[in-house]
Amino acid sequence: MAKGAREKIRLNSSAGTGHFYTTTKNKRTMPEKMEIKKFDPVVRQHVIYKEGKIK
């Protein structure tokens, strides 16, 4: 089977709580860094999550 184009990424909270989500994205169709608004349960608000590397 061929290797997929999807790569695992980590979405870090911009609120500084240390909370994160993990997801995948296609690097060929979305080469820029992802920013998405999601719920942060630590501050109990919707905040912007920015893409970071999985260690």
Swiss-Prot record:
GO biological processes: translation
SUPFAM superfamilies the record matches: Zn-binding ribosomal proteins
Gene3D superfamilies per UniProt: Ribosomal protein L33
GO CC, any one term: cytosolic large ribosomal subunit
Biased composition (Polar residues): 11-23
InterPro entries found in the cross-reference section: Ribosomal_bL33, Ribosomal_bL33_CS, Ribosomal_bL33_sf, Ribosomal_zn-bd
Record key words, sorted: Ribonucleoprotein, Ribosomal protein
Composition bias type Basic and acidic residues, residue spans: 1-10
Region of interest (Disordered), ranges: 1-23
Domain of life: Bacteria
Gene Ontology molecular function terms on file: structural constituent of ribosome
PROSITE patterns: RIBOSOMAL_L33
NCBIfam families the record matches: PRK00595.1, rpmG_bact
Family of this protein: Belongs to the bacterial ribosomal protein bL33 family.
HAMAP family found in the cross-reference section: Ribosomal_bL33 (MF_00294)
UniProt name for this protein: Large ribosomal subunit protein bL33
Organism: Tolumonas auensis (strain DSM 9187 / NBRC 110442 / TA 4)
Upper lineage: Bacteria, Pseudomonadati, Pseudomonadota, Gammaproteobacteria, Aeromonadales
Gene: rpmG
